[in-house]
Amino acid sequence: CPCALGLATPVAIMVGNGMGAKNGILFKTAVSLEEAGKIEIVALDKTGTITTGEPKVTDVICNKGVTEKELISFAYALEKKSEHPLAKAVLAYAEAAQTDIFEVNNFTALPGNGLSAILGSDKLTGGSMKFISSQTKVSADLNRRAEQLAEQGKTPLLFTRNGKLLGIIAVADVIKEDSPRAVKELQNMGIRVVMLTGDNERTAKAIGAQAGVDDVIAGVLPDGKESVIRALKEQGKVAMVGDGINDAPALTRADIGIAIDTADIVLMKSQLSDVPAAVRLSRATLRNIHENLFWAFFYNIIGIPLAAGVWIPLFGWTLNPMFGAAAMSLSSFCV
């Protein structure tokens, strides 16, 4: 019965979609389910994909004669008026520590460098190692500590009061627990894994090492990811994994877009480990389709001539109508 041929593909796709949905993986189309198993390169956006996307304070290092409470209080006063993403991490840490709250005046933000403000008769400054070291003397010990933090993929923020260094607050976007495992699974499946990030190369390589990604492309701004994906597509079939908002152009440019928000494949659980799961499901579905088609063709190549009596002159084979009806149903059931 040719019904088996008609059922071979749609039944497998329906089952694949159902299994994906059950595990929080939504395939937008049947094509995305089929194509996911063919990808050769997976490009992972760092923020929100490999990392949590929510920077947190990881280290607080005070200068001699300065208490952690003082450092956190003055840092809070400065960062409270900042719009920088890392400021939220400092504010959250300070609020959790129930630090003293001060109000500053004459607040100034210096993009790419740091902050400055007046608190009573004191001048407070905060910012990058490069910026603060140009304003005041940084001891060899704290300079070394700041370098070590940067090598670990963290961002060291230095703070001063009247030109005296108070200490360092390190902020980092923490790696998701399942990221290293997911990267390893993809690599074991023969897929090349690439990390895209806007961070500097040293920080990017440190984060990549934590996640197990050797192929890191640093200094990539959101609007530059599309061109990176275009270049990667010349080397193989590419899947881009990122959020559905900032990475929209890159997700569209890739052969397969996988996102936490909206794309060809949507990850409802926001877990990177669902990426290799989606690839495995796609490959299993394709394998099932091929098996279904093989058995459907094999079954009908033998059965149709038998039902038509073609084999009677050659082998004397005949088919009882009752068995023919049963065989027709069995072919669809097997698929």
Enumerate the predicted regions with their spans:
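A short beta-strand->alpha-helix segment at the C-terminal rim
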Residues: A89-D100
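Hydrophobic alpha-helical segments characteristic of transmembrane helices
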Residues: C1-L5, N300
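Membrane-embedded alpha-helical bundles of multi-pass transporters
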Residues: M19, S133, I191, T252-A254, ...
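Conserved catalytic phosphorylation-site environment of P-type ATPases
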Residues: L5-L78, L232, G242, A250
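ATP-driven catalytic headpiece of P-type ATPases
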Residues: G37-L44, I50-E83, N113-V194, V335
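Extracellular/lumenal ectodomain signal focusing on beta-strand-rich modules
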Residues: I41, D59, E103-N106, D215, ...
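Conserved ATP-binding TGD loop and adjacent catalytic N/P-domain core of P-type ATPases
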Residues: F27, I39, L119-S121, G153-T155, ...
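Conserved phosphate-coupling serine/threonine residues in phosphotransfer and NTP-handling enzymes
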Residues: T9, T197-D199, S331
